[in-house]
Amino acid sequence: MDPSADTWDLSSPLISLWINRFYIYLGFAVSISLWICVQIVIEMQGFATVLAEAVTSLDLPVAIINLKEYDPDDHLIEEVTSKNVCVFLVATYTDGLPTESAEWFCKWLEEASIDFRFGKTYLKGMRDAVFGLGNSAYASHFNKVGKNVDKWLWMLGVHRVMSRGEGDCDVVKSKHGSIEANFRAWKTKFISQLQALQKGERKKSCGGHCKKGKCESHQHGSEEREEGSQEQDELHHRDTKEEEPFESSSEEEFGGEDHQSLNSIVDVEDLGKIMDHVKKEKREKEQQEEKSGLFRNMGRNEDGERRAMITPALREALTKQVDAPRERSLLQTHILWNESHRCMETTPSLACANKCVFCWWHHNNPVGTEWLWKMDQPEMILKEAIENHQNMIKQFKGVPGVKAERFEEGMTVKHCALSLVGEPIMYPEINRFLKLLHQCKISSFLVTNAQFPAEIRNLEPVTQLYVSVDASTKDSLKKIDRPLFKDFWQQFLDSLKALAVKQQRTVYRLMLVKAWNVDELQAYAQLVSLGNPDFIEVKGVTYCRESSASSLTMAHVPWHEEVVQFVRELVDLIPEYEIACEHEHSNCLLIAHRKFKIGGEWWTWIDYNRFQELIQEYEDSGGSKTFSAKDYMARTPHWALFGANERSFDPKDTRHQRKNKSKAISGC
């Protein structure tokens, strides 16, 4: 017997693993994909799950159904006799449209509500409650889907057990401070209503003689009666008066008198009286709201003070973002404008007037068109920003690949990028903050979203002023940036014109999103003529994971070669500009005005010491001694130029190449 046959050979399983390595990789990839899908589903069904758990605690059966999988033609009529209470959680997306999962349900419901073949009693006997999710920053269609679903169901005869709830993502105007708090408050009332239904207790129905259901029977108390007789009484009231039992929110859109007109013929000469009556009631309602302080306290807490910009819900979201994995490039020395490892990234304003599809904060930050929050002083913001920057740098002590001299340099802030999140120019004391930076010998890089032209005109000199040009046409800008201003396109154009009169360095920042804004070259060229920027920075969009707030995917990230081709074609349309620099790692190219090409050499970099001298002279002269971008330019090193083999990687540094070079679906 051969003794070697009984000896376990380690090489055999290793060889087997190597041969089947692709199947192992595939298994890991599938497992990770399934895990990500599960996480997304859990996040999307968060509110529904919370509500289901609360209902289950009452010993009531409950089921969560995705509206995408729900056929209203077959199942809604079944709810008439089922005695179930149907709760609809619906969100309002761009332009007041429903989300993709609720699109068919809403379309069917709208058509059925106006189809005479269904009638006003088609769903009589069905019981429901609606909670809408929206953002009041978009006032023209705030919670439009929730309101419509509530209205359409009511028009088909559905019986409300609870008034419509409205969740508001805008932490400033949200009644309870966040959409989660809005939902919790509504859920508490809904659970109380279910408990009352269990006991056979119902709120006393209105007799139809009050204005919009504001009588005592809607505000106070309830009376005990048999559930069967209660429902008969309510159905009787509905048939005779066409009013809504229980609480209702659709009286805002359809009052008792308005609804009565649906069942009666109105003479043409009476329409004027009816419209006058409706307008009068609307004015009375607005006056009543003003007296109660709804308008006066917008953006304020219960004590009448301005709300803090960072709410508990927002702080939790910010913490998740800060804990994200840090990239190797954090301490890289060179980028388009020289050193970056000494650059502190911060913002005095988390708020923004846009909800861009590629925003890496996934719309957790507040939005608004004006400042509505408590304001921290510039001195405090700068002090804490420097401390937090230093604490972040300290985390890299001893990390492989981090050079000791750069670690020490990084502890001293030399530059400040006001671009972390939000719209820095919204901060009321932005000019004071900039002066503090310059007094500390810190250069300033400010990025604005081109929606505040007046603030751009009034801005003090900065080292470099960026304007985000995410699209070149009105339609594409609305699609990509999703701005809050109704006149967003005019604001955008005026902002670019305001940039043209600035004497310091100005930059257009173009973010390319494949299939969305890469085919508008002629329009981009026209926008360049408006602002006459010193530089145009063109960058491929960066993918920042899946988000329910955006449809952006990896497929929208352009390859670097595609960005280069776009830039070449754009330069052909703007003869005063040329391609100057390239940073392949950032998927970014720099187009510069020819005035920065002196003697055949590019001077696109910044002489920071000279800038500090110039800004000091400007301050000492009270603003009379001005200076221009050419006064503090520096020569661009050869390895940062477009076409150089280094592609902006400093030859003194060590370049780390990715070992796995498998084909990806995008340029990310």
UniProtKB/Swiss-Prot annotation:
Listed Basic and acidic residues bias regions: 213-223, 233-243
Domain Radical SAM core: 336-580
Catalysis: reaction(s): N(1)-methylguanosine(37) in tRNA(Phe) + pyruvate + S-adenosyl-L-methionine = 4-demethylwyosine(37) in tRNA(Phe) + 5'-deoxyadenosine + L-methionine + CO2 + H2O
Cofactor(s) named in the record: [4Fe-4S] cluster
InterPro entries: Aldolase_TIM, Flavdoxin-like, Flavodoxin/NO_synth, Flavoprotein-like_sf, rSAM, tRNA_wybutosine-synth, tRNA_wybutosine-synthase
Recorded metabolic or biological pathway in which this protein acts: tRNA modification; wybutosine-tRNA(Phe) biosynthesis
Coiled-coil residue windows: none
Gene3D superfamilies (UniProt xref): 3.40.50.360, Aldolase class I
Co-factor note (free text): Binds 1 [4Fe-4S] cluster. The cluster is coordinated with 3 cysteines and an exchangeable S-adenosyl-L-methionine.
Annotated residues for binding of [4Fe-4S] cluster: 352, 356, 359
Flavoprotein found in the keyword field: no
GO biological process terms held by the UniProt record: wybutosine biosynthetic process
Pfam family, any one: Flavodoxin_1
Group of enzyme by EC: lyase
Keyword Protein biosynthesis in annotation: no
Keywords: 4Fe-4S, Iron, Iron-sulfur, Lyase, Metal-binding, Nucleotide-binding, S-adenosyl-L-methionine, tRNA processing
Ligand binding (FMN): 43-47, 130-162
EC number(s) recorded for this UniProt protein: 4.1.3.44
Acidic residues bias: start-end ranges: 244-255
Gene Ontology terms, MF aspect: 4 iron, 4 sulfur cluster binding; FMN binding; metal ion binding; tRNA-4-demethylwyosine synthase activity
Domain Flavodoxin-like residue range list: 37-191
Record protein name field: S-adenosyl-L-methionine-dependent tRNA 4-demethylwyosine synthase TYW1B
Source organism: Homo sapiens (Human)
